[in-house]
Regions:
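Short beta-strands and strand-loop turn motifs
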Residues: 11-13
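Secondary-structure "cap/kink" motif recognition
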Residues: 1-8
Protein backbone atom coordinates (compact mmCIF):
# COMPACT_ATOMS: atom_id res chain seq x y z
CA UNK A 1 0.00 0.00 0.00
CA UNK A 2 2.60 2.54 1.10
CA UNK A 3 4.91 1.79 -1.82
CA UNK A 4 2.04 2.58 -4.21
CA UNK A 5 0.93 5.83 -2.52
CA UNK A 6 0.61 8.83 -4.83
CA UNK A 7 -1.00 11.56 -2.71
CA UNK A 8 -1.45 10.76 0.96
CA UNK A 9 -0.73 8.29 3.73
CA UNK A 10 -2.49 8.34 7.10
CA UNK A 11 -1.28 6.00 9.84
CA UNK A 12 -3.03 5.66 13.19
CA UNK A 13 -1.27 3.35 15.61
CA UNK A 14 -0.26 2.71 19.21
CA UNK A 15 2.95 3.89 20.85
CA UNK A 16 4.51 0.43 20.54
CA UNK A 17 3.21 0.13 16.99
CA UNK A 18 4.90 3.40 16.10
CA UNK A 19 8.23 2.12 17.40
CA UNK A 20 7.89 -1.08 15.35
CA UNK A 21 6.79 0.78 12.23
CA UNK A 22 9.64 3.28 12.49
CA UNK A 23 12.16 0.60 11.58
CA UNK A 24 10.06 -1.33 9.10
CA UNK A 25 8.44 1.54 7.20
CA UNK A 26 11.03 4.34 7.41
CA UNK A 27 12.56 3.57 4.00
CA UNK A 28 9.17 3.41 2.26
CA UNK A 29 7.88 6.55 3.98
CA UNK A 30 11.05 8.43 3.00
CA UNK A 31 10.60 7.40 -0.65
CA UNK A 32 6.92 8.37 -0.52
CA UNK A 33 7.84 11.79 0.89
CA UNK A 34 10.35 12.25 -1.96
CA UNK A 35 7.49 11.56 -4.41
CA UNK A 36 5.49 14.36 -2.78
CA UNK A 37 3.15 12.17 -0.74
CA UNK A 38 1.71 13.89 2.36
CA UNK A 39 2.21 11.67 5.42
CA UNK A 40 0.31 12.03 8.70
CA UNK A 41 0.78 9.77 11.71
CA UNK A 42 -1.29 9.73 14.89
CA UNK A 43 0.01 7.83 17.90
CA UNK A 44 0.23 8.33 21.66
CA UNK A 45 3.70 9.70 22.32
CA UNK A 46 4.99 9.67 25.88
CA UNK A 47 8.65 10.20 25.00
CA UNK A 48 10.36 11.69 21.94
CA UNK A 49 12.54 8.72 20.93
CA UNK A 50 15.16 8.63 18.19
CA UNK A 51 12.71 6.63 16.03
CA UNK A 52 10.07 9.33 16.36
CA UNK A 53 12.60 12.06 15.59
CA UNK A 54 13.53 10.21 12.38
CA UNK A 55 9.88 9.77 11.39
CA UNK A 56 9.25 13.49 11.96
CA UNK A 57 11.66 14.16 9.08
CA UNK A 58 9.20 12.59 6.64
CA UNK A 59 5.82 12.82 8.39
CA UNK A 60 3.67 15.07 10.50
CA UNK A 61 3.14 13.29 13.82
CA UNK A 62 0.48 14.19 16.37
CA UNK A 63 -1.12 12.55 19.36
CA UNK A 64 -4.85 12.91 18.68
CA UNK A 65 -5.85 10.65 21.54
CA UNK A 66 -7.16 7.98 19.18
CA UNK A 67 -7.04 4.34 20.21
CA UNK A 68 -6.98 2.58 16.85
CA UNK A 69 -4.76 0.86 14.32
CA UNK A 70 -5.34 1.65 10.67
CA UNK A 71 -3.73 3.07 7.55
CA UNK A 72 -5.38 4.99 4.71
CA UNK A 73 -3.59 5.45 1.38
CA UNK A 74 -4.75 8.01 -1.19
CA UNK A 75 -8.27 7.90 0.31
CA UNK A 76 -8.74 4.69 -1.69
CA UNK A 77 -7.28 1.83 0.38
CA UNK A 78 -7.64 1.05 4.07
CA UNK A 79 -5.84 -1.49 6.23
CA UNK A 80 -7.17 -1.85 9.75
CA UNK A 81 -6.28 -4.16 12.58
CA UNK A 82 -9.00 -5.88 14.58
CA UNK A 83 -7.42 -5.71 18.05
CA UNK A 84 -5.18 -3.48 20.13
CA UNK A 85 -1.61 -4.73 19.87
CA UNK A 86 -1.40 -4.94 23.68
CA UNK A 87 -4.25 -7.49 23.65
CA UNK A 88 -2.97 -9.92 21.05
CA UNK A 89 0.20 -11.85 20.28
CA UNK A 90 1.79 -10.56 17.03
CA UNK A 91 1.53 -13.96 15.35
CA UNK A 92 -2.26 -13.94 15.89
CA UNK A 93 -2.85 -10.35 14.83
CA UNK A 94 -5.42 -9.91 12.07
CA UNK A 95 -5.71 -7.05 9.62
CA UNK A 96 -8.21 -6.37 6.87
CA UNK A 97 -7.22 -4.58 3.67
CA UNK A 98 -10.00 -2.91 1.70
CA UNK A 99 -9.79 -1.19 -1.68
CA UNK A 100 -12.90 0.94 -1.45
CA UNK A 101 -12.76 4.60 -2.29
CA UNK A 102 -16.12 5.30 -0.59
CA UNK A 103 -15.13 3.91 2.83
CA UNK A 104 -11.49 5.06 2.67
CA UNK A 105 -12.54 8.58 1.73
CA UNK A 106 -15.11 8.75 4.54
CA UNK A 107 -12.59 7.48 7.11
CA UNK A 108 -10.00 9.92 5.78
CA UNK A 109 -12.46 12.81 6.13
CA UNK A 110 -13.19 11.85 9.75
CA UNK A 111 -9.48 11.58 10.49
CA UNK A 112 -8.78 14.99 8.95
CA UNK A 113 -11.59 16.59 10.96
CA UNK A 114 -9.78 15.45 14.10
CA UNK A 115 -6.34 16.33 12.72
CA UNK A 116 -7.42 19.88 11.88
CA UNK A 117 -9.64 20.72 14.87
CA UNK A 118 -8.70 18.77 17.98
CA UNK A 119 -6.09 20.32 20.25
CA UNK A 120 -2.84 18.40 19.88
CA UNK A 121 -1.53 16.72 23.00
CA UNK A 122 2.21 16.92 22.23
Amino acid sequence: MIKEAENSIVIVTTEEGLKRKADVLAKYLRKAKERGVAIKISAPIKKETDEIKELRKVAEIKDLGLSARFCIVDNESVMFMLAHDADIHPSYDIGIWLNTKFFASALGQLFNLNWNTIKVKN
